[in-house]
Amino acid sequence: MTIHKEGYRSLFYVSAFLFLLNFLIYYFFPEASILQKTVLVISLLIFLVVLQFFRNPSRTIEINDNQIIAPADGKVVVIEEVIETEYFNEKRRQISIFMSPFNVHSNRNAVSGIVKFFKYHPGKFLVAWHPKSSTENERTTTVVQTKNNEQILMRQIAGALARRIVWYIDENSKVTQGEEFGFIKFGSRVDLFIPLDAKVKVSLNQTTVGGKTVIAEFYS
């Protein structure tokens, strides 16, 4: 278990603030031992909570070109047929994974291939389960084309708490299934838009593990 690089700055600021807070408490209230201990315990709890937000467990990924794997840890909250209007302009199967603040927040490539389309959208910060969060919130859209010419759209969506999306890919870059393509600080949601003829292997409310859980399979 390591700490993700996206957490270094946040952890530094949190540590500095908590250190200063405890220093001031000890300095101005030298006799208030109960207050000192209470603030210290609360500070440690806050630090541990923030620390777990940025944990980055090591995972062994088994690449399978016939599978679409989970891009994030979380829970499946949507499985439905929709018309995807940003890129495909046709019917696709949408599978959405909600990432709580207590999930690992790194995002992984669902398939291997070439990035055919990428776009960042500034936007609102509606709660992740809001029906319009997929189209109105801050988000990124990434389309990867596999070697078999299947196209998968992955959408990172910021939420009410997650107010910063990070990505590590560009159009025409080559990506590998299971490798990190981005990070959403403090959770939120990742949507997948897959072909209608792909066989879905997950169910609503199922827990997913990024890079491990098989979301769907392409028909051979």
Curated annotation (Swiss-Prot):
Belongs to the phosphatidylserine decarboxylase family. PSD-A subfamily. Heterodimer of a large membrane-associated beta subunit and a small pyruvoyl-containing alpha subunit. This is Phosphatidylserine decarboxylase proenzyme. The gene is psd. The active site is at S188 (schiff-base intermediate with substrate). It comes from Cytophaga hutchinsonii (strain ATCC 33406 / DSM 1761 / CIP 103989 / NBRC 15051 / NCIMB 9469 / D465). Pathway: Phospholipid metabolism; phosphatidylethanolamine biosynthesis; phosphatidylethanolamine from CDP-diacylglycerol: step 2/2. Its cofactor is pyruvate. NCBIfam families: PRK05305.1-2 (NF003678), PRK05305.2-5 (NF003685). GO terms for molecular function: phosphatidylserine decarboxylase activity. It catalyses: a 1,2-diacyl-sn-glycero-3-phospho-L-serine + H(+) = a 1,2-diacyl-sn-glycero-3-phosphoethanolamine + CO2. It is found in: Cell membrane.
